[in-house]
Structures are given as C-alpha cells and as structure tokens.
C-alpha cells in the first residue's frame, strides 16, 4: 500500500477535526481578537503582559500595537490563538479604531475599555468618545457583513444577549454593546483614598454604564490578587476559559461584576437630590447620569485630552541617522516653500 502524501495526511487531519468539532455544542473558533482601548497611561499594556505571562517592563504605546498569545485547552490539542490589539494615545487616535475591526475578525471580537480611576475628570469624556467611535465603526462593519452573511450577524446578536438572563428585570431597558465589552477601572490603589462621596458617584456611574451596555465591570491595581482576577477575565475573552460568576458591588472594595449579574434596581438612582434631577433636562437615562457625573467631575477642555506631543520627536524612539535625515528634509522643505513663495510673488508682479 503506497504511503500517504503530506497533503493527504493534512486533509485527513482537517476532516477529523471537523467531525470532532461537530459533536456536542460544537467547537469554538480557535482564533479570537481582543482590542484594548482606554485612558492614556491607564495600564492597558501592563494588563496584556500579565495575561500573557510576560515578565517585561511595559513601554508606552505609540499608536496601535499588536501582539498575540497561544494556549492549548488540553493535552495533544492544537493551541488556540488570541490576537491582542492596543490603541495608544487615549482619545487622540480614534481613526485607528477601524484597523483591528473587520468583517473577518468581528465574529470572535471583544473590547476591553481601561479607564484611569485616578483621573475622574477625564473618565467620562474618554469613555464616551472611545465607545461612540468604536460602536459607530462596528455598526458599519455589521451592516456590511449582513449583506453577505445575515446568519453570522444574527448569531452575533444572539450571542451578545446570552449574557443577560431572559427573566432579568432589565431585559427591555438595556442596549447591549454590539461586541462583548469589559470595562476595567485601573489604579484602584489611588482611587481607594478618594472621599467616600466621590467614590460612590464613580462606582454607581460605571455600574450604570456597564449594565446598560451589557458589559462586565471590574477594578484593578498593582495588587497581584486583583491582577489575577483580571487575567482570568481576559483569558475568558481570549481563550474561552470558564467565566467567573463572583460579584462585588461594595464601593469600599474593588468592584467585580460579571455581565448580567447587576441590575438598575441594585444600582439605584443617580446620586443627586431628587429636587435637582428635574433641573438637569436630560433626554435619556444615559444623559442624566452624564450630567450628574460631570456636575461633580467637570471635564477638562477636549484639547487637553488629546496628546499634542509629536511622536516623531519622542527620545524613546530616537534613531540618529533617521533623525538627521529628517532634519535635512525639513530644511529642504522650508527652502522649497520660501522659493515657491518668491516665484508666485514674482509672477504676480509681472502680471
């Protein structure tokens, strides 16, 4: 009997996986995508490195960074692949959000929003700008995908609702984010020293936003115990590891609320005197919470939220030969501009 060729062996292996994957509930796609966005210097890189067991100091993310991790679910099984994308610069690089989110990645895509709890005045605008920009692009991709694969879009929407029990009292009141969303409040070690009333407003506001979007919410710091809990959540997104069902809603402790386990009844109304609520003139619950939050933590000018520093001049990325050539080209450009300006003036005089 002739020996099998490499292609025949590969074909048989693929068919074998297909048969095994069709048993039970079906095998999950072994490739997932996790996109980290959030506050500038909020700790996104640290969380990613911790999840991948990489013992290296985090470096500032210049624009859009990519890395990946691999993990086997069992002995002698193919390793699942998780693609990690990270957007740097806070809200200054919103245009780059579209790069990791495509029709090919969307079906196994998750979003992680990391918010710096130590800077409460920046928290709402950072959260709002990033979530709006991401949702807008995801909606466009879903609409385009729906024209060619309506079944995939339907399955995605159903999957989003799976986190919310059908008998949940808020089932008709929430508007789940179009992809799985986890909101992480970082630098809890600084946040825990805030005044009680400030912590209360921040905690209740983030609980409302997370529950409204069908998202998980948790706080973290440099504490090894908290980082391990966050690692477990990210591993669930990246590798399908069992989801934690633990919950902590005590504002005097780090919040940890898995999607679907909170409720508007438990969160309560916005922390503002009842006679003041009518004066806020909000058109939706989300707008009401925003007005209440920004009354205590007024946002800084939008210009201050953007990173105006030129990355090309960052000493961390210095390269002598390239930098010298850049200086030379900048000088040549200035000379060209002056020369062109003189030429046009001469033409105007001659005419």
From Swiss-Prot:
Its annotated compartments are: Golgi apparatus; Cytoplasm; Cell projection, Cilium; Cytoplasm, Cytoskeleton, Cilium basal body
Alphabetical GO biological process terms = determination of left/right symmetry; intraciliary retrograde transport; intraciliary transport involved in cilium assembly; regulation of cilium assembly
Residue ranges crossing the lipid bilayer per the database entry? none
An example Gene Ontology CC term for this record: cytosol
> Is Lipid metabolism a UniProt keyword of this protein?
no
Q: Does the keyword Cytoplasm apply?
A: yes
Instruction: Report a single Gene Ontology molecular function.
Output: dynein heavy chain binding
Keywords, alphabetical: Cell projection, Ciliopathy, Cilium, Cilium biogenesis/degradation, Cytoplasm, Cytoskeleton, Developmental protein, Disease variant, Dynein, Golgi apparatus, Microtubule, Motor protein
**Lineage: superkingdom:** Eukaryota
Instruction: Describe the function of this protein.
Output: Acts as one of several non-catalytic accessory components of the cytoplasmic dynein 2 complex (dynein-2 complex), a motor protein complex that drives the movement of cargos along microtubules within cilia and flagella in concert with the intraflagellar transport (IFT) system, facilitating the assembly of these organelles. Involved in the regulation of ciliary length.
Q: Which disease is it linked to?
A: Short-rib thoracic dysplasia 15 with polydactyly: A form of short-rib thoracic dysplasia, a group of autosomal recessive ciliopathies that are characterized by a constricted thoracic cage, short ribs, shortened tubular bones, and a 'trident' appearance of the acetabular roof. Polydactyly is variably present. Non-skeletal involvement can include cleft lip/palate as well as anomalies of major organs such as the brain, eye, heart, kidneys, liver, pancreas, intestines, and genitalia.
Q: Note the subunit structure.
A: Light intermediate chain of the cytoplasmic dynein complex 2, a multisubunit complex composed at least of eleven different proteins. The cytoplasmic dynein 2 complex consists of two catalytic heavy chains (HCs) and a number of non-catalytic subunits presented by intermediate chains (ICs), light intermediate chains (LICs) and light chains (LCs).
Any idea what this protein is called? Answer: Cytoplasmic dynein 2 light intermediate chain 1
Q: Which organism is it from?
A: Homo sapiens
């Amino acid at each position: 009997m002739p020996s099998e060729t490499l292609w025949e062996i590969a074909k048989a292996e693929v068919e074998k996986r297909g048969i095994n994957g069709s048993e039970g509930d079906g095998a999950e796609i072994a490739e997932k995508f996790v996109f980290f966005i959030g506050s500038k210097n909020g700790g996104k890189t640290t969380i990613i490195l911790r999840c991948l067991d990489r013992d290296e100091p985090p470096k500032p993310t210049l624009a859009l960074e990519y890395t990946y991790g691999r993990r086997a679910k069992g002995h002698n099984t193919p390793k699942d692949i998780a693609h990690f994308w990270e957007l740097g610069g806070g809200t200054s690089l919103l245009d780059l959000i579209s790069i990791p989110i495509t029709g090919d990645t969307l079906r196994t895509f998750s979003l992680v929003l990391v918010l710096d709890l130590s800077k409460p005045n920046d928290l709402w605008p950072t959260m709002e700008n990033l979530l709006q920009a991401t949702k807008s692009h995801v909606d466009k991709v879903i609409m385009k995908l729906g024209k060619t694969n309506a079944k995939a879009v339907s399955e995605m929407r159903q999957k989003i609702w799976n986190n919310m029990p059908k008998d949940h009292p808020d089932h008709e009141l929430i508007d789940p984010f179009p992809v799985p969303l986890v909101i992480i409040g970082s630098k809890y070690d600084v946040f825990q020293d805030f005044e009680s009333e400030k912590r209360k407003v921040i905690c209740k506001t983030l609980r409302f936003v997370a529950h409204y979007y069908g998202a998980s919410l948790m706080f973290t710091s440099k504490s090894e115990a908290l980082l391990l809990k966050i690692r477990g959540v990210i591993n669930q997104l990246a590798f399908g590891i069992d989801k934690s069902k633990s919950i902590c809603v005590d504002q005097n402790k780090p919040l940890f609320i898995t999607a679907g386990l909170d409720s508007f009844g438990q969160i309560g109304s916005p922390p503002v005197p009842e006679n003041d609520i009518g004066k806020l003139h909000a058109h939706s619950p989300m707008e009401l919470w925003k007005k209440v939050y920004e009354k205590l933590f007024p946002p800084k000018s939008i210009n201050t939220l953007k990173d105006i520093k030129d990355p090309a001049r960052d000493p961390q990325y210095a390269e002598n030969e390239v930098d010298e050539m850049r200086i030379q080209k900048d000088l040549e450009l200035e000379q060209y501009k002056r020369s062109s300006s003189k030429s046009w003036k001469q033409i105007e005089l001659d005419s």
